[in-house]
UniProtKB/Swiss-Prot annotation:
Binding-site residues for GTP, renumbered to this chain: A273, C274, G275, K276, T277, N278, R390, R421, F516, G517, D518, N519
Cellular component, GO annotation: cytosol
Positions annotated to bind Mn(2+): K230, H250, D297
InterPro entries: PEP_carboxykin_GTP_CS (IPR018091), PEP_carboxykinase_C (IPR013035), PEP_carboxykinase_GTP (IPR008209), PEP_carboxykinase_GTP_C (IPR035077), PEP_carboxykinase_GTP_N (IPR035078), PEP_carboxykinase_N (IPR008210)
Cofactor binding note of this UniProt entry: Binds 1 Mn(2+) ion per subunit.
MF (Gene Ontology): GTP binding; manganese ion binding; phosphoenolpyruvate carboxykinase (GTP) activity
Pathway, per record: Carbohydrate biosynthesis; gluconeogenesis
Catalytic site positions: C274
Matches recorded under CDD domains: PEPCK_GTP (cd00819)
Database matches in Pfam families: PEPCK_GTP, PEPCK_N
Subunit field text: Monomer.
Protein name: Phosphoenolpyruvate carboxykinase [GTP]
Entry function: Catalyzes the conversion of oxaloacetate (OAA) to phosphoenolpyruvate (PEP), the rate-limiting step in the metabolic pathway that produces glucose from lactate and other precursors derived from the citric acid cycle.
């Protein structure tokens, strides 16, 4: 038999009535064997990871290679975000919009109550107090995740600020927190043996925007189970941001220091697997410039009293796609990972107790144990690591972490980049004509689908601001919020907006631009545009660099490649304008008039 409400109230390390009532209610519903309040300590983490190793969920890695690090291997049916089972249950269907799945809230609550009834039987119910952003921010954003997964506790300890200190702050009168409940949906009957990766074939990731609640059932995988990440910091936070006058975005934050020692901050949005982490941890090939990072995935932005748009990273860790992250492509990420204290999921194991994935090293090991537990050699048909395998690493292990990461109020932005993955049409970099034109660029961002989301690979899909799977309300209202919000700021201080595409191909199918560290040449061109120093050609789509204005010193690139990278083809853009027209029609009446005006302007300029 599970617990009654009373023991929760007797032993809980909090007096917050709303929190106590909610924990008691969830315990009564889910019937766990015991309740544990997470304190976030080192001793607790050691005990939990020891238990996970004993259960077969985690494998302890060779401490000489990866100190205090572990690898986990999921059920093959639980490897990515499940967008088709992700719901925004707003009170009115219109408020969810066409980009989200919707169900009537009362109907969904009935369904969830049925699924969660007894779902934690035989398991420990962990209560994780956490904060997104800084504890000493003006308005800290608290959450409490209830979960029956110790793997989630260990991962949340890396990804957010958790435990006793947070709980102490939640004690303060009027402290608001987002309640987030997660269950693997794998109750254990007395005497029933557990499996290494419990989950359920039926999965539901549900958000109630008005009451700021998150319910997640059936999946133990990162984005579905670490509820502070996409569920809170983007889906629920985007609704809070709309209501409170700020922005919650799927963006990295960079700090750039020029040879003249002038500092600039830049945010950038990219859909999954378009090089976001590589740009966040950029190793510049351009002389005299220094690059530091403040974050690789999520950015919260608001206007300060002086009218500047400031950005903060609400996360405490990196949850990066492993394949393609390597010593030659992203040495900064690899150095952070090599320090240990990490949890890897669905990577391959080396024979000496380390981890490996495609793209990690130039040489492939002669033998591995693949993510499914099978013996693997370079002749094997399948990749050794799952394409969406992950590393979960503390952000403070990054050598190039900017000290401003610790500023509760964030940093003032000079520029915002939007980038997709397109073989044709979109040039290497385009500066928008103005702020609204920049929102137009962001609203039409497009990319070819990747392994990070379950579904078809290689289809071009529109991904406004790289937020398509993460907007917690109507997408047209979200774009309207971008248009309206700028009026709060000092128009002179608004960040300049640029559209980038590292993935343009030449006629023979090769990449037109080398990418990786050489993307610093594009980023510095953008900064020099802000300073009025770099030349550009005005095209129907915006301002594109002249060949001479890019610093190509030491770069091995042919004239043909550069021409292909910067080309604005009128025929391709005529087709693109039609495609955008089709995309915009999907918004119905909620698309801002300003963006329809931008599309008409583009068509006119294309003639």
């Amino acid at each position: 038999m599970g617990l009654t409400a009373q023991p929760v109230l007797d032993t809980a390390p909090t007096t917050n009535k709303r929190l106590l009532d909610w924990v008691a209610e969830v315990a009564e519903l889910t019937q766990p064997e015991s309740i544990y309040w997470v304190d976030g300590s080192e001793a607790e983490n050691t005990r939990l990871t020891d238990e996970l190793v004993a259960a077969g969920t985690l494998t302890r890695l060779n401490p000489e290679l990866f100190p205090n690090s572990f690898a986990g291997f999921s059920d093959p049916k639980d490897v990515a975000r499940v967008e088709e089972q992700t719901f925004i249950c707003s009170e009115k269907e219109h408020d969810a919009g066409f980009t989200n799945n919707w169900m009537e809230p009362a109907e969904m609550r009935t369904k969830l109550s049925g699924l969660f009834k007894g779902s934690m039987r035989g398991r420990t119910m962990y209560v994780i107090p956490f904060v997104m952003g800084h504890l000493d921010a003006k308005s800290p954003k608290f959450g409490v995740e209830i979960t029956d997964s110790a793997y989630v506790v260990a991962s949340m300890r890396i990804m957010a600020r958790i435990g006793t200190e947070v709980l102490r702050k939640i004690e303060e009168p009027d402290a608001f927190f987002v309640p987030a409940i997660h269950s693997l949906g794998a109750p254990l009957e007395p005497g029933q043996a557990d499996v290494p990766w419990p989950c359920n074939d039926e999965k539901w990731i549900v958000h109630f925007p008005e009451s700021r609640e998150i319910w997640s059932y059936g999946s133990g995988y990162g984005g579905n189970a670490l509820l502070g990440k996409k569920c809170y910091a983007l889906r629920i936070a985007s609704v809070m941001a709309h209501d409170e006058g700020w922005l919650a975005e799927h963006m990295l934050i960079l700090k750039l220091t020029s040879p003249e020692q002038k500092t600039y901050y830049m945010a950038a949005a990219f859909p999954s697997a378009c090089g976001k982490t590589n740009l966040a941890l950029l190793d510049p090939t351009i002389k005299g410039w220094k690059v530091e990072t403040l974050g690789d995935d999520i950015t919260w932005m608001n206007f300060d009293d002086e009218g500047a748009l400031r950005a903060v990273n609400p996360e405490a860790g990196l949850f990066g796609v492993a394949p393609g992250t390597g010593w030659d492509t992203n040495p900064n990420a690899m150095r952070a990972i090599a320090k240990g204290n990490s949890i890897f999921t669905n990577v391959a194991l080396t024979d000496d107790g380390g981890v490996w994935w495609e793209g990690m090293t130039t040489e492939t090991p002669s033998h591995l144990t693949d993510w499914r537990g099978n013996s693997w050699t370079p002749d094997s048909a399948e990749p050794a690591a799952h394409p969406n395998s992950r590393f979960c690493t503390p952000i403070d292990q990054i050598d190039m972490l900017a000290p401003e990461y610790n500023e509760p109020d964030g940093v003032p932005l000079s520029a915002i980049l939007f980038g997709g993955r397109r073989k044709t049409t979109i040039p290497l970099v385009t500066q928008s004509r103005d702020w609204t034109n920049g929102i137009f660029m962001g609203s039409t961002l497009s990319s070819e689908t990747t392994a990070a989301a379950a579904g078809a690979v290689g289809v071009v899909r529109r991904d406004p601001m790289a937020m398509l799977p993460f907007i917690g309300y109507d997408a047209g209202d979200y774009l309207k919020h971008w248009v309206e919000l700028s009026k709060q700021g000092d128009q002179e201080k608004l960040p300049k907006i640029f559209l980038v595409n590292w993935f343009r191909r030449t006629a023979d199918g090769g990449f037109a631009w080398p990418g990786f560290g050489d993307n610093s040449r594009v980023v510095t061109w953008a900064i020099e545009r802000i300073e009025g120093k770099a030349d550009a050609v005005e095209t129907p789509i915006g301002f594109v660099p002249t060949k001479e204005s890019l610093d190509l010193d030491g770069l091995d690139i042919s004239d043909e490649q550069l021409s292909a990278a910067l080309n604005v083809d009128a025929l391709e853009w005529a087709a693109e304008a039609e495609s955008i027209d089709e995309w915009y029609r999907r918004f119905g009446g909620s698309l801002p008039e300003e963006l329809l005006g931008e599309l008409e302007g583009l068509k006119e300029r294309l003639g």
